Every structure is written in C-alpha cells, then in structure tokens.
C-alpha cells in the first residue's frame, strides 16, 4: 500500500510545483525573453489549458491501457517540457513549453486519483485525499522559497532544471515502484448492469462534481485575487503579503492533516456540510468586514472550509466508479479547471472588484452545495458503509 500512496503523492505534486516553482523568476524570464511580465502571466492560463487538454484523453487511456503507462509517459513528457522551457529564447516557445508541461501534469494528476480509487476503500480514500490536500498546500509556500534560494546563485533556467529532476524522480518511481492497479473487466454478462452503475450522468456523481467544481473555483478565486486584495486594497507590502499567505497555508495544512482523525468521529456528510457553512460564514464576514483582522479571519475560513470538505467530496465523487475511475477523474479535473477559469474570466469581464468576486462565489458555492448535500444523498450501500465506518 505504501508504494501506491508514495507514487500517487509524487504524481499529484508535479501539478502545483509546475505552477509555483517558476513564479519567483518571472521578472528575469521576461527580461531575458524580451517580453513583459504581463505577457508571461498568461503562462498560468496556458499551463491550465494544457492540463485540461490532457484530461480529455488521459483518463480514458488509463482505463483501457492501465495507470502505469500513463504515469510513465506523463512524467517523461514533464521532463521534456521542463527542458524545453529551460532552453527557450522567445516568449512564444516558452508558452509552448508551459502548455506541454500542463499536458504532462494533467495526465499524472488524473492517474494519481485513479490509483487511489483502485487501491483504497471509501473511508481510507477520504482520509488519504485530505492528507494529500494538506501536502499540496505546502507547495505554494515552499516552492517560491526554494526558487528564491536557487536563484541566489543560479540563473532562472535552473528552476526548470529542478523541475526536470522532479520529473525524473517521478518517472523512476512510476517505472520501478508503481504496480498496475487497473481492475480487470467483469464477466460480459455483468457489463450492462455495471455500466449503468458507473454512468457519468449519475445524479449522485453530478452533485459531487458540481460541489467540487464550485469549491475549487472558490480556492482559485482566492489565490487569484489575493495579491490585489492584500497588497492594493489592504496596503500590505510584499513581505507582509508573503507572511499572510504562509499563515493561510498553515491553516489549510492544519485542517487537512486533522481531517482524517475527525472522520473517525463524524461521517463525511457532516464534514462537507461544515465546509459549506464555513464558506457561507466567510462570505458574510468579508462582506461586513471593516478591519484588516476581520478580513483575514474571513480568508482563514475559506482555507479551512476547502481543506475540511474537498478531499471527502472528491472521494465520494469517485466512489461509484471501478472500471471507469480514470474517466471519472478526468471529468472532475476538467470541470474544476474550466469552471474556475470561466468564473474568473466572467467576473473580470463584468468588472467585479477582487472582494466582490470572492464574496460572490463564496455565497453561490455555499448555497448551491448545501442544497445538493441535503437533497442528494449517497446511494444506500455507501450510506451503510459510512455509518459502519464511523461506528468502528
């Protein structure tokens, strides 16, 4: 079991590392490539576009050919893309490299969740996904610090060489440590009944798809508007902003790491309801805040709410799928990336302020999700398993 957890964690961590590692070198990259920082900021969107593109096919391939081949190819592509980014001389080639990096990260991300679905039952999967969420929260804090330390002695290209090394390590783990987890097909006579149970149009799956998409939209909106909110509206300098973001990351980590223990006392539905109540409370707090301390409390509620509920919701979303776990993971990833990007784009077009953009999605997410959690309950078997897990 340890090998699957290690490989899954490594596969997932390529995604946030690819986003956060290079940001500290962005001014130098822009200078060397003859582009403005504003032009290179599109590299974030290009990276997400690459991830979404990969998710369109990676899950289906993983279900048909296996998890291990997709993991190996994804890690190998990440290595190649990182080398491309390190060697480019124009901004257009840099963006191409970032797109390919996104394809690689998206493939690995999908496979990681499929592996966890294959190897863990509902109860353990919810706990592991909560831990994974906590580990992922460490990357936005550590990656820029590591990048800064690297650039004290080496040029910005070394950031992508570091990512190359990460890709090589993931590839080695995928080749030598990871074992194939794809379930074998059931007897032909059982296929129609099995397929009906694993439909992507299943009411329960669609409800968890919407809940997780809205939750990711909340957290990505928070990340996107935090520089404007804290440095322009609240008057923080870069140092204070970094400290505030580190504090929020610590809240996320603390809640994520404690969630597995809380799951031993409460059922998953209670944690998801708590998550949405925290989102609603955060929206109300931010809309009424007149002091910086109160605003920071509201932002802390966002981090806590996401951390306590997202892993559980993802586990429930993947629960009904055995043979189609890869496809289900792909659909979840695409919806989350595209849904959050769509909201941020629409809010910018409408002209919402940073604060109103955040408050709007908090209120919408909490109300819609609370209704779905109260109306759409898990299948009877899953409910029984949840209750048995809590009692034990």
UniProtKB/Swiss-Prot annotation:
Transmembrane helix keyword on record: yes
GO MF annotation list: transmembrane transporter activity
Entry's Gene Ontology cellular component terms: plasma membrane
Bilayer topology: Multi-pass membrane protein
One Pfam family cited in the UniProt record for this chain: MFS_1
Swiss-Prot/TrEMBL keywords: Cell inner membrane, Cell membrane, Membrane, Transmembrane, Transmembrane helix, Transport
Protein location: Cell inner membrane
CDD domains hit by this protein: MFS_MdfA_MDR_like (cd17320)
Top-level taxon of origin: Bacteria
Major localisation: membrane
Keyword Electron transport assigned: no
Transmembrane regions listed in the UniProt entry: 4-24, 38-58, 69-89, 95-115, 131-151, 158-178, 209-229, 246-266, 270-290, 294-314, 331-351, 357-377
Protein family according to the UniProt entry: Belongs to the major facilitator superfamily. DHA1 family. MdtL (TC 2.A.1.2.22) subfamily.
Name of the protein described by the UniProt record: Multidrug resistance protein MdtL
Organism: Klebsiella pneumoniae subsp. pneumoniae (strain ATCC 700721 / MGH 78578)
Recorded name of the encoding gene: mdtL
